[in-house]
């Protein structure tokens, strides 16, 4: 774990976060600056900087992130209305924390194309 990685520190519970799910491989917590009424970050406990660094050995964890996000959308009550899942990769796409994270956004109507 890189010592300066914000999300590694959250996953290790060195920094506070409102956890909505956790297991031995991933954690999910409420976004500190939500962009929708429901905005959850899902991250692997293993440090992976971005989608560009997802290796063959990481394929299962990416699938688990997506499956867990769908389950949380159901639990939080907005799955039937619809929700958005987003991986941002690198600066021009809006990635500000270089630890793989999946945004789960729901509770409002989204437009296309996104911002």
Region spans (language model):
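HIT superfamily nucleotide-processing domains
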Residues: 1-115
